[in-house]
Swiss-Prot record:
The lineage of its organism: Eukaryota, Metazoa, Chordata, Craniata, Vertebrata. Heme b b562 binds at residues 83, 182. This is Cytochrome b. GO terms for biological process: mitochondrial electron transport, ubiquinol to cytochrome c. CDD domains: cytochrome_b_C, Cytochrome_b_N. Heme b b566 binds at residues 97, 196. It comes from the Eukaryota.
Length: 379
């Protein structure tokens, strides 16, 4: 008798995606982050659902409702901190996943890559709106500063900002709509994940060598399910350590002060995972220029397939490109650090230098290095 998982209409889909899926035999741990992102999304949706049961999206009660969750709800503090730190884990996995794609040339699967960029934007939007919900000082002022960036749009900027605010400042209407969208977007992300996987399974996975692996495939289960479980254990260990021992490590102390429109915090900054983009935004003195640089710092990923000049797909056998890749990683870390510093000398100059280096590495240096490698390897 044929196995049920191979004939049942629903189980068949799961079977071809996670059980009998032919996978390259040489996948390294860098291929773990896709499954870890799935786990992160599930954790965020579950913890978020329980938080939404107790949260009220009203300016008068939002801050107090979060306090109530932490003090009075059974394990509410744990759910809240799992959600907040789960977002940090989500972005760590996201950046690792994107970095893996850049290093091993996975961006040549253009549909999968473009859906991935959409997913990145959707996740960033969700995280930004989630940061506003506790209605602390940094929530309020972060929302004010970031939404105000839209006023740089020529001609319709001011109207656009007021339309998003639902008034003349960040207020009750803004908080209510941000809560609605923060609740809705993860489900849209889940749907996009399905499309992401659909396109990936059209081509099959890339592998560390960048060479087609059709002659050498192994079943996904048990080889990669056990590998994914090991990665999951590492993720859950890191997350629970953060939640149970140092839940506020990555947060901002200002967010424990209720939002006050009359009192501006000395340093307004977003969560750590947006600091690199925030540093690029602040590096440009012109408002519209800064906003464009901010958007392009992420959107630049979309043109990376067009900038691929190497005859090889992966960077595994390309030492020059490897050096530039790790320079880019170090540069992003420097930008993250600068984004958290005040706008004063020498941080301004460091931020501007790192921003120029970020764009020039991707747009000029990496394509040139790839061409040089083609010559060196006589390809």
């Amino acid at each position: 008798m044929t196995n049920l998982r191979k004939v049942h209409p629903l189980f068949k889909i799961i079977n071809t995606s996670f059980v009998d899926l032919p996978a390259p035999a040489s996948l390294s741990s860098w291929w773990n982050f896709g499954s870890l992102l799935g786990v992160c999304l599930a954790v965020q949706i579950l913890t978020g659902l329980f938080l939404a049961m107790h949260y009220t999206s009203d300016t008068a009660t939002a801050f107090n409702s979060v306090t109530h969750i932490c003090r009075d709800v059974n394990y509410g503090w744990m759910i809240r901190y799992a959600h907040a730190n789960g977002a940090s884990m989500f972005f760590i996995c996201l950046y690792m996943h994107v970095g893996r794609g850049l290093y091993y040339g996975s961006y040549t699967y253009s549909e999968t890559w473009n859906i991935g960029i959409l997913l990145l934007f959707a996740t960033m939007a969700t995280a930004f709106m989630g940061y506003v919900l506790p209605w602390g000082q940094m929530s309020f002022w972060g929302a004010t500063v970031i939404t105000n960036l839209l006023s740089a749009v020529p001609y319709i900027g001011t109207e656009l900002v007021q339309w998003i605010w639902g008034g003349f400042s960040v207020d009750k209407a803004t908080l209510t709509r941000f809560f609605a969208f923060h609740f809705l977007l993860p489900f849209i992300i889940s749907a996009l994940v399905m499309v992401h996987l659909l396109f990936l399974h059209e081509t099959g996975s890339n592998n560390p060598t960048g060479i087609p692996s059709d002659p050498d495939k192994i079943p996904f289960h048990p080889y990669y399910t056990i590998k994914x479980i090991l990665g999951l254990l590492f993720l859950l260990t890191a997350l629970s350590t953060l939640v149970l021992f140092s839940p506020d490590l990555l947060g901002d102390p200002d967010n424990y002060t209720p939002a006050n429109p009359l009192n501006t915090p000395p340093h307004i900054k977003p969560e750590w995972y947006f600091l690199f983009a925030y540093a690029i935004l602040r590096s440009i003195p012109n408002k519209l220029g800064g906003v464009l640089a901010l958007i392009l710092s992420i959107l630049i990923l979309a043109i990376i397939p067009l900038l691929h000049t190497s005859k090889q797909r992966s960077m595994t056998f390309r030492p020059l490109s490897q050096c530039l890749f790790w320079l880019l990683v170090a540069n992003l870390m420097a930008l993250t650090w600068i984004g958290g510093q005040p706008v004063e000398h020498p941080f301004i100059v460091i931020g501007q230098t790192a921003s120029v280096l970020y764009f020039s590495t991707i747009l000029i240096l990496m394509p040139l290095a790839a061409l040089a490698e083609n010559k060196l390897l006589k390809w």
